[in-house]
């Protein structure tokens, strides 16, 4: 499959009538997975996105997801207190004030997911670069947490993005056990996009494709 088919995968997943709740997009580094995904999700709401590369805790992962959902910004480093302060929890605001620094991004995320669940609206959560997850993060616990969100909220859609060939033990065994239970479909990206639709001219397309081949 070519990289320029990734938008079709996202649209299919993000459809209320889709049979999928969780899919994986896998491809070699530099083939254009993240490029296509980031270009596509600018037009989608609500979307939570986190690249696991360089993230050192589960709390930080969900902090980045929450930040993207609430403020629609992309930052490599997230101030969790800033995230907590930015989230309007309505009737739960007094609880947030009582908890103070103990307040968890995951608590706020679950509140937001519940709001969309009650409205019957899809919310898409994207976890990129999962093969680069830090050794400081409990991979089994992370995947189990994502699975529990899927079980609790049927309108949550999950997109995992990775280079599966770069999974090594013990993460490989953990992932294989998890994916058999939860991932509905794995899409393998084997070719670069023929064109990059967000760029205006063939010259720009050619330049971008050449850049992606080298990175």
Regions found by a protein language model. Name each.
Residues 8, 113-165, 172-174:
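Conserved Walker B catalytic segment
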Residues 36, 40-41, 171-179:
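Short, aromatic/basic amphipathic alpha-helical patches
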Residues 21-22, 27-123, 135-139, 185:
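P-loop NTPase nucleotide-binding core
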Residues 1-14:
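N-terminal pre-Walker A segment at the start of P-loop NTPase domains
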């Amino acid at each position: 499959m070519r990289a320029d088919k990734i938008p079709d995968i996202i649209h299919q997943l993000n459809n209320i009538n889709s049979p999928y709740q969780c899919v994986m997009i896998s491809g070699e580094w530099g083939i254009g997975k993240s490029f296509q995904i980031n270009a596509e999700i600018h037009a989608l709401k609500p979307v939570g996105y986190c690249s696991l590369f360089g993230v050192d805790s589960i709390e930080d992962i969900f902090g980045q997801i929450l930040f993207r959902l609430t403020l629609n910004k992309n930052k490599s480093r997230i101030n969790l207190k800033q995230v907590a302060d930015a989230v309007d929890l309505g009737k739960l605001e007094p609880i947030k004030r009582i908890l103070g620094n103990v307040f968890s991004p995951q608590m706020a995320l679950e509140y937001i997911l519940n709001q969309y669940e009650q409205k019957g609206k899809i919310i898409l959560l994207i976890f990129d670069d999962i093969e680069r997850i830090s050794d400081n993060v409990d991979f089994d616990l992370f995947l189990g947490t994502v699975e529990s969100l899927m079980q609790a909220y049927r309108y949550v859609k999950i997109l995992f993005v990775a280079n599966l060939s770069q999974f090594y033990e013990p993460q490989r065994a953990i992932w294989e056990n998890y994916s058999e239970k939860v991932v509905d479909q794995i899409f393998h990206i084997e070719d670069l996009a023929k064109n990059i639709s967000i760029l205006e001219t063939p010259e720009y397309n050619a330049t971008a494709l050449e850049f992606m081949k080298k990175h």
